[in-house]
Amino acid sequence: MAVPVLETERLILRPLSIDDLQDVFKWTGDPRVNKYMIYPLYKSVEDGREWLESVNKDDDKKDFGFVYKETGELIGSGGIYYHPDREVWSIGYNISYDYWNKGLVTEAMKKITSWAIENFDVKVIAGTFAVGNTGSQRVMEKLGLTFYEDTEYSKLDNSETFKAKTFSKIVKK
């Protein structure tokens, strides 16, 4: 199933495309946003090309761009990703620094997870965040996820490893 266009009070959630390359760099190239992200800091707009070209090609990954209705600007992205080996759907998200602490990620992810639950056989939703990333922890708590385990993860280029926590929620047994 293709990623649809969804709407919340303040956001339009839509598929990402290569046309978003310049806007995506606003957060992927910002060290404040990138601090705990799995991908390395993008040093140029072109660093995001490979990711954007791949986002809509994997049926198990549902990525959305977050468009702020008030300005029409693409301000972040997030999604839900199926892991068939574990029958778990994981969530991930990021947003431009200027939009932190406004409840926008929670608003977007509530809509995205509700859409996934309505359209797929979602049994468990999980998310992992670095210890110290209190903003991400708050989003997961507001989504109803609770502590599952201590873990760790590394950036894709192995430049940094983080102590982390995984939160989860059983949707149905």
PLM features: residue spans?
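A short helix-loop-beta-strand connector motif used in the catalytic cores of GNAT acetyltransferases and
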Residues: E53-G65
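Acyl-donor (CoA/ACP) binding surface of acyl/acetyltransferases
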Residues: M1-R32, D63, V67-K173
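Juxtamembrane/interface motifs at transmembrane-helix termini
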Residues: K43-E46, V55-K57, K69, S96-Y97
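Conserved GNAT-fold acetyl-CoA-binding loop/helix
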Residues: R32-E53
